[in-house]
Amino acid sequence: MPLTGLEIYKQLPKKNCGECGTPTCLAFAMNLASGKASLDSCPYVSDAAREALDAAAAPPIAKVVLGAGPTAVEMGDETELFRHDKRFYHETAIAIQVSDNLSSEELKAKVEAINGLNFDRVGQHYTIQAIAIRHDADDPAAFKAAVASVAAATQLNLVLMADDPDVLKEALAGVADRKPLLYAATGANYEAMTALAKENNCPLAVYGNGLEELAELVDKIVALGHKQLVLDPGARETSRAIADFTQIRRLAIKKRFRSFGYPIIALTTAANPLDEVLQAVNYVTKYASLVVLRTDAKEHLLPLLSWRQNLYTDPQVPIRVEEKLNEIGAVNENSPVYVTTNFSLTYYSVEGEIESTKIPSYLLSVDTDGLSVLTAYADGKFEAEKIAAVMKKVDLDNKVKRHRIIIPGAVAVLKGKLEDLTGWEVIVGPREASGIVAFARANLAS
């Protein structure tokens, strides 16, 4: 929890000098607590007090950056246990694992397939964020070659997975500027791993065999001066991993246990790709900031990415599209006009069905604060007056010759009033988007 004004006041010099712009230190403390002032405004605060206040004000889970440049991914910096309390902020990063045991041709083909993992769904663009290269070969040079090959073939972020710091060091030399995640520091190698991560300013995964060992290892690494950490509590069985992830998140959020105040990495282990995706869905749901999978099939990953997108939307703000007149196909002055709300799911469902009719059409989206048709109508946000006003706003009269507009069947009651307000012919369309194709064939086919 954030500090109160009185708790902050105890750390201040209590000089009441007024140089911060407020007459007393207590008033300044109250402003700090409410976010209206910065500690930098006080010239007399001690270094110890500043460190204590900065630590208290720090987010319960640190922000860790994977990668560099425009593709860099922010992990952590979360404040809630439950999405409905506020929201989750940084989407789980998805990484696809490749092995240095693959031949150069196999590796090239694998990376090419991973680069193609891009999806567009209901107006949202989905993609993965990283490729994880695992050192499985007996020859350390194979790992260096694999890392170099992957780095040259992709702009995705990198995760370098090797237990031997010397092997990692050789491979990292050519890609250090891309700030890959180094996996992983253990009780046996943490000093060398930490030195390598510090030297190259890279995030470091910390692997512990259980929560107690993990906490002790994190404290040792932080004492060595590196705080860009990602946690792996070691569990690979799904229910055990979920239990550990939940404990880490709960202790970080509720108890401010700093040893667990870092993002979590999860590795899937299921042999069957569908089971692997189910594992990943559970890990995304239960607090993993980075999930590493082996499957790279689009049909396996799309459900996972769709779930991630839904989980990380703001539950207090409906997903919506812009209020405007949208063109579907090569429209002309004879094209039919449909109208719907700007709720994203409704809009893209209608748009997809209109595209399936193969009839170039206009689709007018009306701003209903992101509510669906019936919900917006019940709330008074999708009424004849509102539709008429938007029609005038987009100058619809001059867009088409035949003044007729198709409204959703669920709000057929709007037909008469909308005709009176606009002078247009109002056609009552189907109640569901799935009926648009049959409706168009029956009513719009020339």
Curated annotation (Swiss-Prot):
It holds the Pfam family CdhD. Keywords: 4Fe-4S, Carbon dioxide fixation, Cobalt, Iron, Iron-sulfur, Metal-binding. PROSITE patterns: 4FE4S (PS51656). InterPro entries: 4Fe-4S_dom, Ac-CoA_synth_d_su_TIM-brl, ACDS_complex_subunit, AcylCoA_decarb/synth_gsu, Dihydropteroate_synth-like_sf. One of its GO terms (molecular function) is iron ion binding. [4Fe-4S] cluster binds at residues 17, 20, 25, 42. Residues 2-59 form the 4Fe-4S domain. 5-methoxybenzimidazolylcob(I)amide binds at residues 340, 346, 370-373, 433. Its cofactor is [4Fe-4S] cluster. The keyword Metal-binding applies. Binds 1 [4Fe-4S] cluster. One of its GO terms (biological process) is carbon fixation. Heterohexamer composed of 2 subunits of AcsC, 2 subunits of AcsD and 2 subunits of AcsE. Acts as a methyl group carrier in the anaerobic acetyl-CoA pathway (Wood-Ljungdahl pathway) of carbon monoxide and carbon dioxide fixation. Binds the corrinoid 5-methoxybenzimidazolylcobamide which is then methylated by the AcsE subunit. This is Corrinoid/iron-sulfur protein large subunit.
